[in-house]
Swiss-Prot record:
Keyword Magnesium: no
CDD domains to which the protein is assigned, alphabetical: RHH_NikR_HicB-like (cd22231)
Protein name: Putative zinc finger protein ORF104b
Transcription in keyword set: no
Start and end residues, zinc fingers (C2H2-type): 62-85
Pfam families (alphabetical): RHH_1 (PF01402)
Keyword annotations from UniProtKB, A to Z: Metal-binding, Zinc, Zinc-finger
GO molecular function per UniProt: zinc ion binding
Organism from which the protein derives: Acidianus filamentous virus 2 (isolate Italy/Pozzuoli) (AFV-2)
GO annotation, biological process: regulation of DNA-templated transcription
Length: 104
């Protein structure tokens, strides 16, 4: 498993119990909350009512041209196109790339 970052992990380890007690959270809820604050974990609604959540890494969101499902990674959209729409070796005409605005 890749390490997130030393700074976030150290802060998480040091402050977890204190944070969970102050905010009346369980340990797992406290971990999620700290990571959400530190890593910009987003939930992105799609036109079909599905919600995609994940860590925004480079401000890019990939949307399927056919069903408008959104993914936070290029790999995710490629797998989606192969599985759902039976498109072998998907390339850019099948993908709408949204760059920049996290509040999209």
């Amino acid at each position: 498993m890749k390490r997130i970052s030393f700074k976030v992990e150290d802060e998480l380890a040091r402050n977890l119990d204190k944070y969970s007690m102050q905010n009346h959270l369980t340990r797992s809820e406290a971990i999620r909350q700290i990571l959400r604050e530190k890593l910009s974990i987003m939930q992105i609604p799609t036109d079909k009512g599905k919600v995609v959540s994940g860590i925004i890494i480079n401000d890019e969101i990939y949307e399927c041209k056919y069903c408008h499902t959104r993914y936070l990674s290029h790999t995710g959209i490629v797998y989606h196109l192969e599985r759902e729409h039976n498109i072998k070796k998907p390339f850019s005409p099948h993908i709408i790339k949204i760059v920049g605005d996290k509040n999209e």
